[in-house]
Amino acid sequence: MKKSSSFSGSLGFVLAAAGSAVGVGNIWRFPYLCAKDGGGLFLLVYLVLVLTFGFTLLTTDVAIGRRTKQNALNAFATLNKKWKFLGYLTFLVPTLIMTYYSVIGGWITKYFTLYLVSSGDAAAQDGFFTSFITSPVSPIVFMLIFLALTAWVVYCGVEKGIEKYSRYIMPGLLLLIIGIAIFSLTLSYTDESGMTRTGIEGFLVYIKPDFTGLTVQRFLNIALDAMSQLFFSLSVSMGIMITYGSYVKDDVDLNKANNQIEIFDTGVAFLAGLMIIPAVYVFLGTDGMASGPSLTFISLPKVFAAMGGVGRVIGAVFFLALGFAALTSCVSVMETLVANCMEIFRKSRKEMCAAVGVYSLVTAVLICMGYNVLYFELTLPNGSAAQLLDVMDYISNSFLMPFISLLTSILVGWVVGPKWIIAEVEKNGEHFGRAKLYSVMMKYVVPVVMLILFLTSTGLGSLIFGGR
């Protein structure tokens, strides 16, 4: 089947795919895990996994997309008709993620506007974030702004929308992160006890491997953290890379392009740690690190406030960079939904953008209301306390994505065979230097690791085998 939409070339694909991979998780989760898991030790483990596990999953999704020229919904059926159900499972992931990603994008938009109008100090006050997300109107307004931007890019299409904006946004994101990272290294602060901490010391905390108290169990936990971060970072097992792969022209060197995506994604994750860990260490010490929204919307505003006047500028630049990362990722999620719906309903991009936009709006409003009129709290199987947004995130990220990767590894590794993917990577005579490694990973390593990750991330492992 010939796709009517495509990227103009390798660079357009790499920037768009990197934009999808580089999301808020790179910026608010990677630095936290690095600080928690021994600094340089985590970095080393993560790098090894990128070169083995990461490239295997990324290569699989992109190659399936380009060879079948289909979106995820139909691509798996092309490999084997009995596996069509896997396409529907994959379609569920962006369907769920789209319900809440624009809500998070709205939070980022709110904070960016605060710093833009020099009101950033208010964000550093205790209780500000909770007060904002529980407000009945404000989160919906900022979500609408972010969702409108996302829908516009997708509406413009692959080459004139996603590729065009990625060519500007991704270099801009990289420059902003590099700028803040360099600034973080120059920081110095003396606390009330007279202790002075510097950005260079924070940098050493970041990159120096900490083997204190290292046991086999702790190393396995570090490896599992790195694996989960890598898995969620690369946008695999949600149909995005299959969809983007279907837009890649046949003359593009897939192996080279995938390597570039890996480098860009890993580089941004490293720079995010370099941007955040020294700054948080200088003003809050090692106890100031937190994960996710707590780091981004509570800890960092306190850091920016402690910087004084320059903190307002740095805060605006930081949330602009985070907004870029969120936008490119949300665009890829929405594009996957639109592309699949165009296949299902045989309608135009314009019509499906409108339909998916309405769906995203309605569900995002419900997610916003989950912090006020629809508020509830329950305990997930992995032990975490959850509201409505957390439930959607758990089902999509902790349950469906590892499960889909497990099934994909069985399909490719044992049903159609790794040679099916390798042939696509080498179709133009390009050398696939890691072909043997790919085969071993896809047949033996990925299925086992994904089963472990699935049981661990869902909390089902503790329920089945007992223990903590």
Ranges and model annotations:
Residues 327-332, 353-367, 371, 390-424:
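Hydrophobic alpha-helical segments of multi-pass membrane transport proteins
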Residues 1-28, 57-62, 66-78, 84-85, ...:
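Membrane-interface "cap" regions at the ends of multi-pass membrane proteins
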Residues 9-47, 240, 256-259, 263-266, ...:
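Transmembrane helix-boundary motif of multi-pass solute transporters/channels
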Residues 6-17, 42-45, 82-95, 141-146, ...:
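Select transmembrane alpha-helical segments in multipass membrane proteins
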Residues 4-5, 33-37, 70-89, 102-161, ...:
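Inter-helical loop and helix-membrane interface segments of multi-pass membrane transporters/permeases
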Residues 2-7, 167-327, 331, 345, ...:
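Membrane-embedded translocation segments of transport machinery
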Residues 33-37, 63, 78-79, 85-94, ...:
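Membrane-water interface regions at transmembrane-helix termini and the short interhelical loops
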Residues 382-413, 433-468:
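A generic transmembrane alpha-helix motif of multi-pass inner-membrane proteins
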